[in-house]
Design a protein with these regions (language model features):
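A recurrent flexible, glycine/aromatic-enriched loop bordering the glycosyltransferase active site
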Residues: 92, 110-131
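Short beta-strand-to-loop acidic/aromatic patch adjacent to the donor-nucleotide binding site
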Residues: 52-62
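Short beta-strand-to-loop element that shapes/binds the nucleotide-sugar donor at the catalytic cleft/hinge
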Residues: 83-99
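Conserved donor-nucleotide/metal-binding helix-loop-beta segment in metal-dependent transferases, i.e.
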Residues: 66-88
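C-terminal catalytic/acceptor-binding lobe
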Residues: 124, 128-203
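Acidic donor-binding segment of Leloir-type glycosyltransferases
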Residues: 1-30
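A short, glycine-/small-residue-rich helix N-cap motif at loop->alpha-helix starts
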Residues: 33-41, 64
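Active-site nucleotide-sugar/metal-binding loop of Leloir-type enzymes
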Residues: 43-53
Length: 203
């Protein structure tokens, strides 16, 4: 595992992380990244990762409930249609036709997977997630320059591309190709809150 830091991060923050690695999470390699911002660090990480899957999490999230990470990896290995499993920052709510405000405006049960509750979603987001690296490198990276999106972002170009394909071809057909899931069942709990007490995830 690798932890990347933005170059602006203060020394005490880095010391806190290193203390955790030394005393609780042995075996984690800490890399002081020269990049600044989410996109260049994400891009560097996914291109240098030596495992089939990558866990991405920024420093400012509070994970509210336990996550069965080994089971997530088992499911992603078994089912080739599962490419992204993210922790929802809202409950896996009923469908809401307001995609400009809430990315998970479609949530559906996934009956093909019995080992773990996952919810099919219309969202691509970079809140904490496990991603299948081959899917990103073989397909999704080519959407990062999607017209009309912020090209300094990972999330927005991919979300806009995913949403537009859903509008053109329908959710089920497009989801079968993209394979984006929320952790937990439909109407399940939210798993995240921002540590900065921002409004993100409050709706």
């Amino acid at each position: 595992s690798i932890q990347y830091f933005k170059k602006e991060v203060n020394n005490q923050y880095i010391k806190n992380i290193l203390n955790l690695v030394d005393n609780k999470f042995q075996g984690i390699e800490v890399v002081d990244s020269p990049n600044s911002g989410l996109r260049p660090n994400y891009w560097h990480a996914i291109n240098t990762c030596s495992t089939p899957y990558m866990l991405f999490i920024e420093h400012d999230w509070d994970i509210l409930h336990p996550i069965d990470t080994p089971k997530v990896l088992e499911v992603m290995e078994k089912y080739d249609f599962v490419n992204l499993v993210k922790l929802p920052k809202r409950a896996n709510m009923i469908e809401m036709d307001i995609p400009s405000r809430i990315q998970d405006y479609i949530v559906k049960e996934e009956p093909r997977i019995k080992e773990l509750d996952l919810t099919k979603t219309s969202s691509f987001a970079t809140n904490p997630h496990i991603i299948k690296i081959s899917k990103f490198l073989n397909e999704w990276k080519y959407h990062l320059t999607y017209p009309g999106s912020d090209h300094n972002s990972i999330e927005l170009p991919l979300f806009h591309k995913y949403r537009d394909e859903i509008n053109m071809f329908g959710f089920e057909e497009v989801h079968n190709k993209w394979g984006c899931y929320n952790y937990g069942p439909p109407s399940g709990l939210k798993y995240l809150e921002h540590l900065d007490a921002s409004k993100s995830g409050k709706l």
